[in-house]
């Protein structure tokens, strides 16, 4: 094969690459615009409907990817240089009939300390963020053994603890908030952050098989004490959370807000799948 023929092939390949670059750049720009538009819509919808999120108004966002090839992003919400909350956004697979990206709202929270906060992040370079609702963690894979660190509190777990199979990604997209939906109803139960051990009626109900439905949750009055317990890492840990607020999107998609170093909202269908709700009947630890 002559050198001239090699030069011709090289020129053709270079031309094809140059022709493809504007297309790829245009696709990336379109995706970025869709993503930014969507997170702004959700942020404003929450801030304008729930007075507790008023600080989100006129705020700024920073975005980071969660894990490798997970199609999940952490959106840090800041105002005047201070963190005031976060969103966790996922992307559903595109279809040939609808190539437009479809984003879903996996979780959102309020407060100074967000999920995967740098203040609690392990200093090891090999720490990988792994998102799965309440089971979210940093995975440290360095020798001699891998172990996990709680993504909300920075608490390290023993090396013997192993994560369950992810649950959040198994939820149908129609059970999650998606593009075009509005926050239509809110219900406040506990305005101030509370410790689940301040009222321990739920401890005496751990063996109960009765279920609290969404309708029953929604009917509770402000001041009601509801505890959500979630077994983590193959039931090595039982994590209790006090329910603070309830959100309803388009009057159909329900999210539950719990106190956990700040306020965090997860889909009700997820919370019900991984945990159990208890209505506390006692008023103090002594009881």
Task: Go through each PLM region and give its residues.
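A short, surface-exposed interaction/processing loop segment used at functional sites
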Residues: 87-135, 149-185, 254-287
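Exposed beta-strand-loop-beta-strand "reactive/processing" segments of non-cytosolic proteins
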Residues: 51-93, 131-147, 245-246, 257
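Extended intrinsically disordered terminal tails
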Residues: 1-2, 266
């Amino acid at each position: 094969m002559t050198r001239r023929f090699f030069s011709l092939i090289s020129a053709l390949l270079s031309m094809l690459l140059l022709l493809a670059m504007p297309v790829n750049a245009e696709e990336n720009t379109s995706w970025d615009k869709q993503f930014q538009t969507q997170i702004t819509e959700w942020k404003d919808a929450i801030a304008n409907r729930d007075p507790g999120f008023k600080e989100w108004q006129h705020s700024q966002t920073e975005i980071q990817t969660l894990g490798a090839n997970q199609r999940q992003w952490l959106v840090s919400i800041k105002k005047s240089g201070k963190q005031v909350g976060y969103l966790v956004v996922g992307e559903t697979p595109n279809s040939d009939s609808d190539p437009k990206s479809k984003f879903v709202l996996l979780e959102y929270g309020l407060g100074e300390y967000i999920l995967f906060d740098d203040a609690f992040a392990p200093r090891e370079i090999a720490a990988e963020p792994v998102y799965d609702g309440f089971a979210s963690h940093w995975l440290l894979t360095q020798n001699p053994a891998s172990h996990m660190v709680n993504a909300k509190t920075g608490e390290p777990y023993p090396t013997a603890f192993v994560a369950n199979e992810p649950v959040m990604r198994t939820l149908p997209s129609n059970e999650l908030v998606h593009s075009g939906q509005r926050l239509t109803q809110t219900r406040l139960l506990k305005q101030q952050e509370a410790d689940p051990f301040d009222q321990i009626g739920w401890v005496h109900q751990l063996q109960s098989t009765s279920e609290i439905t969404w309708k029953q949750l929604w009917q509770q009055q402000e001041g009601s004490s509801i505890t959500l317990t979630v077994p983590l890492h193959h039931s090595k840990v039982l994590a209790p959370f006090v329910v603070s607020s309830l959100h309803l999107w388009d009057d159909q998609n329900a999210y539950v807000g719990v106190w956990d170093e700040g306020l965090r909202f997860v889909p009700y269908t997820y919370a019900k799948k991984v945990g159990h709700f208890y209505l506390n009947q006692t008023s103090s630890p002594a009881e």
